[in-house]
């Protein structure tokens, strides 16, 4: 009887161990694989090219052009600013640079008192209205607050379905103060092959910070 009881005890113990092992295996199988946020080389090449451009053009706009932008901002005329000859002149400079480097869009942003960024001068053929709210994104803050040449974490599609990658650089006045940021939306058709890096795609990886 004792021997049978001992055998029964051992069998019960074995059953418990097997059940525990089964539960552990099940937990391992249910683990989701870690997401890979490594930017593909082909996409990184586009981003890096755009960052070189925005840094170079911000340097060209430093001082004179940015001083004039600062004056326009200080006048606080809102949408009426776009009717001025000075706005037209500043916009023409951005349009020239935009065509020179092949950018899709080129514009200047400044933050408001709430930390949201709005557009000022826009070099596009159909410019956004002065004061259009662009919200607040980490790359805006990196450029304006930290003085960095900054990149968006993912690309996007404009209203015509064109893929773009956005980059930003601080704009300094003659006193060495950052008064705005220059933005370039650069063509990124390579995103057709990497939809996980397109925030307007259903396959987007969700990386935005």
Language-model-derived ranges and their functions:
Residues 122-157:
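Extracytoplasmic/periplasmic sensor domains and loops in membrane signaling proteins
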Residues 184-201:
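Helix-start (N-cap) segments at beta->loop->alpha junctions
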Residues 161-170:
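A short beta-strand signature within small-molecule sensing/ligand-binding domains used
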Residues 172-182:
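Short hydrophobic/glycine-rich mini-motifs in sensory/regulatory modules
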Residues 19-22:
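C-terminal motif of bacterial Sec signal peptides marking the signal peptidase cleavage site
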Residues 24-26:
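Bacterial signal peptide processing site
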Residues 36-87:
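Extracellular/periplasmic ligand-binding regions of membrane signal-transduction receptors
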């Amino acid at each position: 009887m004792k021997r049978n009881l001992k055998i029964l005890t051992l069998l019960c113990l074995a059953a418990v161990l097997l059940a525990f092992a089964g539960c552990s295996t099940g937990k391992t199988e249910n683990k989701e694989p870690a997401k890979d946020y490594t930017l593909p080389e082909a996409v990184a090449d586009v981003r890096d090219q755009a960052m070189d451009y925005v840094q170079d053009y911000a340097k060209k706009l430093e001082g004179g052009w940015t001083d004039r932008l600062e004056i326009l901002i200080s006048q606080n005329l809102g949408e009426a600013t776009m009717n001025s000859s000075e706005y037209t002149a500043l916009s023409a400079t951005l349009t020239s640079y935009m065509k020179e480097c092949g950018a899709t869009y080129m514009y200047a942003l400044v933050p408001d008192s709430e930390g949201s960024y709005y557009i000022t001068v826009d070099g596009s053929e159909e410019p956004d209205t002065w004061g259009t709210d662009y919200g607040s994104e980490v790359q805006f803050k990196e450029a304006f607050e930290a003085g960095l040449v900054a990149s968006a974490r993912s690309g996007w599609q404009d209203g015509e379905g064109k893929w773009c990658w956005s980059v930003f650089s601080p704009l300094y006045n003659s006193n060495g103060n950052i008064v705005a940021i220059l933005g370039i939306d650069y063509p990124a058709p390579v995103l057709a092959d990497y939809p996980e890096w397109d925030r307007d795609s259903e396959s987007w990886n969700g990386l935005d910070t």
